[in-house]
Structures are given as structure tokens and as C-alpha cells.
Amino acid sequence: MKVNHNHISNTGVNDSEDILEAQDEISIDNNKNQENIWNKKSIFHTWLLLCYSTGPVASMSRTYIPASIQSIAKNVGKTKMNQPCGTQGNDCYVKFGFMTVHHTSYVLYLRAVSTAIEGVVAIFLMGIADYSNYRKSFLIFSILVYGFLALPFIGLTNNDYQTLVLASILYSLLIIDDSIYQILEGSYIPLFMRADKKNPMQRGSVVAVLGLFLGNLGGITALVIGIIISYLSGTPESKGYHNFLLAITIAGCLTIGLSLFSALYIPNVQGKQRIDNFLVLPFKRFFNLLKDIQKYPMAFLYCISWVIWNVSFNNFMSMFLLLFRSTLGLGNSDAEYTVYTFMSYICSSWGSLVWMFLYQKWNSNIKYWGYSFLSVSLLANFWGCLGIHKLTPLGYQNRWEFWVFEVFYSATSSAMRSLNRCVYSSLLPEGNEAQYFGLEVTLGIASGWIGGLVNAVIQDRTNDDRFPFLPNMFLVVVSLIVYYYVDLQKGKNDVNNGNS
């Protein structure tokens, strides 16, 4: 009996083609369903509520927590003459591991070490997030941990070294967890953008701005609570930073409650099919990501500019807020500090919203907005450098300088952060959102801890709180130069060619 092998072969080929066509149809249907989900207003509002839930603890980790650690370090520390530290001035030193450092530098050293650990976590997360079917669960869990880490601060009222160490550990864990939820939260922005086929860039600007605005609004809520506590609960001299500790714990409760409510309605994201083991995947994807530089050069170039600017922004804010208290006096300026940090978040929210409305109205070249925002960053750091010379009456040595630059720097920096998230999302290949947002966080961490360490060493060795503004100013200059060479249109074309 003869068998028609050609018939069998052709039949096998036809079956394979039918299977591939069916898989393509299923993939197209899944993509359409995903687009329909991310077009729903209810889903967008739930995501915004989730952004709001991170705001209370995020604002505390940038304001009250480092201020509290600074105060505890001052109470524990000694002067060069082995006397108790005063409320003003720089003559105060405290033990940090195996060395003794300036009490303000202690916070900068702590942040540098925590950021280095944060980088390892970010590399692992950016490698697995796009392949996981539990992105929603990871996001909610990271925000819950964020809230729970803030709860113990209410008990850290003792002025001893053990309390300082415990506060430092909690602060470090908050910094590490911060990168986790930022990577996962930011990876949702491209999903909302791609759901709008008509004008994804305008959609992205709205999503990025409102997400940041709601986060700031959550921070404002916690800071209002801090103001009420500070002005109703005793004098600054009697209560001091203890008011901060209560506000931090209340912020943790808000974050936990709101994140649990959002978890009921936020949709999950279907992960990509993976072949490698989860332990191998992060490192393999990271090296594959570096190979994509030739394919998406503008995305990488923009990422570098964003990372350098973001490092300078974080350095500036940490130095600026600590300098405010050391210049005006620890303890007796605490009530004013609550209003000061509150105004920072008000200006941040105002800045990003104004930019969103102006951009939608004029729809001018989005890159020119970046130039103007970066110019303000350059001016703010240059102004701080003026104070290095002791005979100069300017350079953040007067109360009015802190308040004026707080308004302009906070507003333009918030707008710049929204702009970066929007533009960067338009340069990312589809299906790799978490990986590329993780790249931004990872590169920021890899370079940020070095910048923080350099600033801490400079401040510690020079005993000058304003000297670190000098290297920070050069970071802004480098960011501006890299930003100049980014061709946004070419970057978008690269993505379209890669997805086609």
C-alpha cells in the first residue's frame, strides 16, 4: 500500500498555518480587550486613587522622616568639645557604623547606602514584572508594606542611639520599597496611552500629570495633618519632632486603607510568555535591554538625561530641606517646617497641573518645556553655590530665599517629572513597559547612591551645608546637554518600526 507523503506533508503545513492564524486572532482579541479595559474611566479613576494612596507615606519619607532622624542624631551627637549639640550650627557629630560623621551628613550617608541596596531590588523586579501575571498583586503588596513600615515611628521618642538605628532601618526599608511601587505604578502609564489611538501623547500627558498630582495630593493630606498636630500639640521646644512621628504613623494608616480599597477595582495585567527561570530572567533581560540600545537609541538617551536630572533633584531636595532646619534652628523652626513642606507639595501640584493645561492649549514642542524647567533647576543650584563664600549674603542664608525658591523649584520640578514620564512612555516598545521604567529607576539608583555619597563626604569634610550644591549644579548641566541631543520624532519612529 502506497502512502501519499506529499499529501501528509501539505496537510501538516496547513494545520500549522491554521494554528498560527488562530493564535494571532486570539492575540489580537486579547489586545483589543486590553485596550477596552484601559479606556474605561472607572479603571483610570481607580489607578489615580492608588497613586493618591502612596502620597501620604511618600511625603513623610521625603520630609518628616529625614527631619526626625536629623533631630535624633542632634540629640545623640556631641560637639568637637564633647558637649551637647546646639539647635543651630554645624558643630555636631554622631556615630555612623565604624566612623563619626556630621549629624546632617548622617542622613545623606544613610540614603546613599539604602539607594545602593535599592538598585539590586530594582534590577530583579524590572526583569520579571512584564512576565508576571501578578503585577497587580505585587503593586498592592508593595504599597501595603510601604504603609506598614510607617506605623512604628510613633514609638521612636527616646533620645538614644538604639532609637536612631531603628529609625534609620525603617527609613532605609521605605526607600527600597519606594522603587518597587514606582516601577509597577509607572508601567501602567503606557497601557493608558496605547488605548487612545487618536492622540496617545496628549493622553499620556493627562495620565502622567494626574497620577503625579494625586500622589502630591495624598502627600498634602498627610502634611495638613502634620500642621494641625504641630500647632495644637504643645510648643516646638516641648514636643519638637515628636509631632512628626505621630503624623508619619497616621500617614501609614491612610496608605494602608486606601490601597486596600483600590485593590478591589484595579485590573490585573496579563504577563508575557516566559521561557527562562525567574531567577535567571532578570539578569538575562537586563543584558538584552542593553543590546536594544542600537534599536531604540533615543529611549536610552532620554532615559540617561532623565536619570541625571532626577539624581540632581533628589540631592537638591534632601540638602535643601535639611539646610532649612539647620539654618533656622532645629526644634524652634519645626512648626514653620510643617508649613514649608506643605507649600512644597502645593507648588508641586500646581506646577504639574498648569503645565498640563498650557500644553493642551498651545500644543507646542514638548521639548521646549523641558529646556525651561531644566533652566530653573540650574538657577536653584547656582544660587546655593553663592552661599559657599562666607561673606556672600545670599545662597540660602535667609528665610525669604528658602520660600521663594521653594515655590519655583517645586513647581517646575513637578512639571518636569510629569513631562519625563509622558515623553519616555512614548519611546517605549510595547510589552516592555515595566522593564524600561525599571531601567530608569535602576540607572537612577546606580548613579544616585554615588551622588548621595559624594555629597555626604563633601558636607562632612568641609563642614559646609552648601558646598554639595556645586557638584549638583554640574549634574544639571550634563542632563541639559544630553537632553539637547534627544530626537523625539526619531525615537517614536523607532518604536513604530519595532512594533510593526
UniProtKB/Swiss-Prot annotation:
UniProt family annotation: Belongs to the ATG22 family.
- The residues that cross the membrane are 108-128, 137-157, 164-184, 209-229, 244-264, 304-324, 339-359, 368-388, 438-458, 467-487
Q: Where in the cell is it found?
A: Vacuole membrane
One Gene Ontology term, aspect cellular component: vacuolar membrane
List the glycosylation sites.
N14
Q: Which PANTHER family match?
A: AUTOPHAGY-RELATED PROTEIN 22
Q: How does it sit in the membrane?
A: Multi-pass membrane protein
Functional description taken from the UniProt entry:
May be required for lysis of autophagic vesicles after delivery to the vacuole.
Q: Can you list the disulfide-bonded cysteine pairs?
A: none
SUPFAM superfamilies per UniProt: MFS general substrate transporter (SSF103473)
User: Gene name?
Assistant: ATG22
**Does the keyword Protein transport feature in the UniProt annotation?**
yes
Protein's name in the database: Autophagy-related protein 22
Biological processes annotated in GO: amino acid transmembrane export from vacuole; autophagy; protein transport
- Origin organism lineage: Eukaryota, Fungi, Dikarya, Ascomycota, Saccharomycotina
| Any Pfam family the entry gives | ATG22
Q: Which UniProt keywords apply?
A: Autophagy, Glycoprotein, Membrane, Protein transport, Transmembrane, Transmembrane helix, Transport, Vacuole
